Amino acid sequence: MTDSNQPTPLQARKSGALHGTARVPGDKSISHRALILGALAVGETRISGLLEGEDVINTAKAMRALGAKVERTGDCEWRVHGVGVAGFATPEAPLDFGNSGTGCRLAMGAVAGSPIVATFDGDASLRSRPMRRIVDPLELMGAKVVSSSEGGRLPLALQGARDPLPILYRTPVPSAQIKSAVLLAGLSAPGVTTVIEAEASRDHTELMLQHFGATIVTEAEGAHGRKISLTGQPELRGAPVVVPADPSSAAFPMVAALVVPGSDIELTDVMTNPLRTGLITTLREMGALIEDSDVRGDAGEPMARFRVRGSKLKGVEVPPERAPSMIDEYLVLAVAAAFAEGTTVMRGLHELRVKESDRLEATAAMLRVNGVAVEIAGDDLIVEGKGHVPGGGVVATHMDHRIAMSALAMGLASDKPVTVDDTAFIATSFPDFVPMMQRLGAEFG
């Protein structure tokens, strides 16, 4: 597993203006879903632009272990021959998802609809993360889950339901992972499986299910929520998938370009799904010079080209209802806030506490060790921006790729270099991050 590797520290130094054009890796969320739905479909699914980070590769290995034929045919080009809904076979060994909560939780939903037994495991970070929120609805649908750890944590054994039940389920928190696990399990159940969420979470699973031929209806629910109804037991058909560039990965060069004076970069093919654009909305409110063009789409997912220039940023208040659309971007938003003039308040960040690390505490620690005034008030993060960051600190990454990349972006514009204690986990989502940033002019060493 990745956590057995020796730490690989890295320092980011104040850089000259960043320039150039880049395409960040394929979207991680869509890459996981393309592999899983391709495995549940009948026939061939061709995927181009797949993210070839460790998290997604572990999902590919899991689908192969469950009986699908999964092969790499070229650079970021993959082919999946699926086994059909409820067609998974019992794997010979535990399914190891490494650091990937998304891959693990979505696969649990997919397996829950097949009459097999599979053991799910991961690295130390994933073993520490809560799984009960996924286990509870799957057990309502007829699956049986056994875990020796408190809170239903990994490793756990999941016995899929022989006769899955359709359910109506209200998610306890806004979570695309919970919703997706229930919908994937619902593929095997007769009748209609319904998920209701009080705050709309990212809808990649719904869009891709439609792309593969499922009947799924989405309706508004209250002020900000959604009701999603899936008709079970469809025959999913293999379909081509073009994976757009990941907006969560694009966030790091984007913020780096905003805070390094004189920068002017372009990022191509970035997904612009409205449930993933909270960061861009917030940065524009802060005064960021971000322009989009060449808007188009594939498999229901829109994408665009972004031009990003060095900008004078100001502090803003970020409302809690925006959290689901940018839950993975708050770390790097905090970096932008540190370079802004004035106070930025980010509200309602409780979900950051159960990510790869306690990202709320880790973000505050990252800023404090580099001389930025920051406060945690309940689930709110308050950053006092002074227009510059002193830097000079060593950031503990806690095996979290997004902490590492956020800290490195900060170091490119801080007064003194910023060091991260380990960059190994960047490979889970963005293996080419360091060389790509160096091509744009970033100073690492």
Swiss-Prot record:
Keywords: Amino-acid biosynthesis, Aromatic amino acid biosynthesis, Cytoplasm, Transferase. It comes from the Bacteria. One of its GO terms (biological process) is amino acid biosynthetic process. Its EC number is 2.5.1.19. Pfam families: EPSP_synthase. Phosphoenolpyruvate binds at K28, G101, R129, Q177, R359, R402. Residues 1-25 are annotated as: Disordered. InterPro entries: Enolpyruvate_Tfrase_dom, Enolpyruvate_Tfrase_sf, EPSP_synthase, EPSP_synthase_CS, RNA3'P_cycl/enolpyr_Trfase_a/b. Transmembrane segments: none annotated. Its main location: cytoplasm. It catalyses: 3-phosphoshikimate + phosphoenolpyruvate = 5-O-(1-carboxyvinyl)-3-phosphoshikimate + phosphate. The active site is at D328 (proton acceptor). Pathway: Metabolic intermediate biosynthesis; chorismate biosynthesis; chorismate from D-erythrose 4-phosphate and phosphoenolpyruvate: step 6/7. GO terms for cellular component: cytoplasm. 3-phosphoshikimate binds at K28, S29, R33, S175, Q177, D328, K355. GO terms for molecular function: 3-phosphoshikimate 1-carboxyvinyltransferase activity. It is found in: Cytoplasm. Belongs to the EPSP synthase family. Monomer. Catalyzes the transfer of the enolpyruvyl moiety of phosphoenolpyruvate (PEP) to the 5-hydroxyl of shikimate-3-phosphate (S3P) to produce enolpyruvyl shikimate-3-phosphate and inorganic phosphate. This is 3-phosphoshikimate 1-carboxyvinyltransferase.
